[in-house]
């Protein structure tokens, strides 16, 4: 899970409020998600954002070019430029995470993360999502992650609650019990 700095949260909150005032939340959310996906898949972009070897001016112009070519909204392009100008380019992913949380809360959607040892099918994801929606009494957006170290079973996080029904956790509990015996 991404950790967000207080600064990243402040930038995200400012963008969220501005986008909300302009009625542009969905567009900004879409742009932010697309840009975050780009960061996650491009080692060069991560290096640009994280490295102090690149000047702020280089970062600003590179981000402006990316925003232009990707067709991001002008507001989102300005946001990226502002973060780079203020030396916060390395906080963009944290700001995206915070923005995403604000957006979900505004829409009344709860987020859940499910981790399994192997990729889940669409039907499995849908079933878990519908079960969670019934439990929480509202909409749930499910994100799935693959973690082979779980061996089998499932880990489910909804808000601050974690249900760990993985084989790895069961083996860990058995090991603890056996050591105590």
Curated annotation (Swiss-Prot):
Xref: Pfam families: OSCP
Organism the protein comes from: Hyphomonas neptunium (strain ATCC 15444)
Protein location: Cell inner membrane
NCBIfam families registered for this protein in UniProt: ATP_synt_delta
InterPro entries xrefs: ATP_synth_OSCP/delta_N_sf, ATPase_OSCP/d_CS, ATPase_OSCP/dsu
UniProt family annotation: Belongs to the ATPase delta chain family.
Membrane protein topology class: Peripheral membrane protein
Protein name stated in the entry: ATP synthase subunit delta
Keyword terms of this UniProt record: ATP synthesis, Cell inner membrane, Cell membrane, CF(1), Hydrogen ion transport, Ion transport, Membrane, Transport
PANTHER family in the record: ATP SYNTHASE DELTA CHAIN
Known partners and oligomeric status: F-type ATPases have 2 components, F(1) - the catalytic core - and F(0) - the membrane proton channel. F(1) has five subunits: alpha(3), beta(3), gamma(1), delta(1), epsilon(1). F(0) has three main subunits: a(1), b(2) and c(10-14). The alpha and beta chains form an alternating ring which encloses part of the gamma chain. F(1) is attached to F(0) by a central stalk formed by the gamma and epsilon chains, while a peripheral stalk is formed by the delta and b chains.
A GO term, aspect molecular function: proton-transporting ATP synthase activity, rotational mechanism
GO cellular component: plasma membrane; proton-transporting ATP synthase complex
Superkingdom of origin organism: Bacteria
PROSITE patterns: ATPASE_DELTA
Function noted in UniProt: F(1)F(0) ATP synthase produces ATP from ADP in the presence of a proton or sodium gradient. F-type ATPases consist of two structural domains, F(1) containing the extramembraneous catalytic core and F(0) containing the membrane proton channel, linked together by a central stalk and a peripheral stalk. During catalysis, ATP synthesis in the catalytic domain of F(1) is coupled via a rotary mechanism of the central stalk subunits to proton translocation.
């Amino acid at each position: 899970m991404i950790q967000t700095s207080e600064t990243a949260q402040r930038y995200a909150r400012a963008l969220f409020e501005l986008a909300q005032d302009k009625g542009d939340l969905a567009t900004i959310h879409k742009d932010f998600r697309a840009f975050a996906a780009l960061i996650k898949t491009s080692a060069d972009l991560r290096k640009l954002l994280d490295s102090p070897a690149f000047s702020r001016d280089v970062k600003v112009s590179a981000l402006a070019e990316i925003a232009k070519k990707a067709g991001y909204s002008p507001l989102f392009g300005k946001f990226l430029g502002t973060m780079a100008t203020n030396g916060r380019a390395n906080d963009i992913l944290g700001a995206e995470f915070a923005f995403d949380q604000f957006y979900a809360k505004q829409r009344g959607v709860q987020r859940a993360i499910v981790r399994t040892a192997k990729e889940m099918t669409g039907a499995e994801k849908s079933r878990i999502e519908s079960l969670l929606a019934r439990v929480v009494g509202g909409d749930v957006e499910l994100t799935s992650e693959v973690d082979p170290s779980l061996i089998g079973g499932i880990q489910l996080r909804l808000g601050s609650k974690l249900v760990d029904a993985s084989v790895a956790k069961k083996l860990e509990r058995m090991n603890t019990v056996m050591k105590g015996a």
